[in-house]
Design a protein with these regions (language model features):
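Intrinsically disordered, low-complexity, charged terminal extensions of DNA damage-control enzymes
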Residues: 1-36, 41
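Catalytic cores of DNA base-excision repair glycosylases
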Residues: 24-174
Length: 174
């Protein structure tokens, strides 16, 4: 079997597994009406960014309710920038690792400078390169890759703990 064939086989099997077992209910990966986006369709970079930072060292089932409350209080980047740090930390209460909330708040201010307050809903104004995202506090390569691939449907690598675990199982490494 050629190497390219084995890659195609791995991709096929992973996509089939996800179709049967994946989390299809995650609100930041759905359209506003709750439907699944088409391939190539952009989702909210803001909503995905907040979710990805919340998901750092926290399970999805815990993040879901916090993310929904966050989006009610800070529905846009501008709402987040206009909030004071105390308010941001109050909404983070219970998630732990409060430095993540502080970094989100700092990053929001930097993103507004980069994007401009008039362009927050224009996905073409948001960063789409890993090197741009990792300049923001609290964003590493895996988080940046996940934001870019989810929000902009671009093929960028994500090598987080889950991906490493899958590869380890595939090649029998402990």
């Amino acid at each position: 079997m050629e190497f390219a064939d084995s890659i195609d086989n791995i991709q096929f099997n992973l996509l089939n597994w996800f179709a049967s077992n994946g989390r299809h209910f995650i609100p930041w990966k759905l359209r506003n009406d709750g439907s699944i986006p088409d391939q190539g369709e952009f989702l909210s970079p803001y909503e995905i960014w907040i979710a990805e930072v919340m998901l750092q060292q926290t399970q999805v089932k815990v993040v879901l309710s916090y993310w929904e409350k966050w989006m009610l209080s800070f529905p846009t980047l501008i709402h987040l920038v206009e909030a004071d740090e105390h308010e941001v930390l109050m909404h983070w209460q219970g998630l732990g690792y409060y430095s993540r909330a502080k970094r989100i708040h700092q990053s929001a201010k930097l993103l507004i400078e980069h994007i401009g307050s008039d362009n927050i809903f224009d996905t073409s104004c948001w960063p789409i390169e890993i090197d741009q995202w990792i300049q923001l506090p609290g964003i590493g390569k895996s988080t940046a890759g996940s934001i870019i691939s989810s929000a902009f449907d671009l093929p960028v690598p994500i090598l987080d703990g889950n991906v490493k675990r899958i590869f380890s199982r595939m090649v029998s490494i402990e």
